[in-house]
Amino acid sequence: MAGRRQGTVERITSETKIMADLTVDGEGKAELRTGVPFLDHMLSLFSVHGFFDLKLQAEGDLDVDAHHTVEDIGICLGGALAKALGDRKGIRRYGHAVVPMDEACASVTLDLSNRPFLVYRVPTLAARVGRFETELVPEFFRAFCQHGGATVHVQGLYGSNTHHILEAIFKALGRALDQATRFDERRSGIPSSKGTL
C-alpha cells in the first residue's frame, strides 16, 4: 500500500475561512495558525503523538467568540481525514489509547466505521483555560466525528487540572487514531464483515 495518504479541505463561510491539510503517514509535524492558541497547542500534541503532519490555517469571527472557528476546524480536520483514508481498505479501523498527564488520565476509543457518533464523558472542567472556552471541546469532537466518519468515545477518567485533562485527551486522540489508520498486513479489503463501511 504505497504512497502517503493525504487529504485537504477548504471551507469558506460568512463566519470562517479554513484550510486543513492532513497527512496520515507523517512525522508528527504541525503548522498551525488558527487564531486560537490553546487549540493550536492541543492539535500540535495530536499531531506529534499520532505521527500526523497537519497544516491548518483559520480565520474566523473571533471578535464574537471562538465557537464557529473551533467547530469549523473540527469539520475540516474530519473531512481531511476522510479524504486521506479514501475507501479505508486495509486499515485496522479500531484504536484505543489511555494517556496520563500528571494527576490526570484520559482515554479515547474510536472506530473508523463511517458511522459518526460521539460519546463525551469528561468531568466538569474550569470554564476557561486562558481565553479558551472549554465547552468548545465537545463541539470540536462532534464536528470531527461527523465529517471524519468516526465513532469516538472520549473519557476524562480523572484529574483536577483542566489543562492536564484536555492535554491527555488530545494526546490519546492522536495515539488512538494512529492505531486505527495503520495498515493491517493481514487484510487487503474493507475491514468489515459487510464488505463496506
From Swiss-Prot:
Key words of the record: Amino-acid biosynthesis, Cytoplasm, Histidine biosynthesis, Lyase
A GO-annotated cellular component: cytoplasm
InterPro entries: IGPD_sf, ImidazoleglycerolP_deHydtase, ImidazoleglycerP_deHydtase_CS, Ribosomal_Su5_D2-typ_SF
EC number, UniProt record: 4.2.1.19
Pathway stated in the Swiss-Prot or TrEMBL entry: Amino-acid biosynthesis; L-histidine biosynthesis; L-histidine from 5-phospho-alpha-D-ribose 1-diphosphate: step 6/9
HAMAP family assigned: HisB
PROSITE patterns: IGP_DEHYDRATASE_1, IGP_DEHYDRATASE_2
Catalysed transformations (reactions): D-erythro-1-(imidazol-4-yl)glycerol 3-phosphate = 3-(imidazol-4-yl)-2-oxopropyl phosphate + H2O
Localization of this protein: Cytoplasm
Gene Ontology terms: biological process: L-histidine biosynthetic process
Protein family: Belongs to the imidazoleglycerol-phosphate dehydratase family.
Family matches, as Pfam families: IGPD
Domain of life of the native organism: Bacteria
Molecular-function annotations in GO: imidazoleglycerol-phosphate dehydratase activity
Main subcellular location: cytoplasm
Record gene name: hisB
Name the UniProt record assigns to this protein: Imidazoleglycerol-phosphate dehydratase
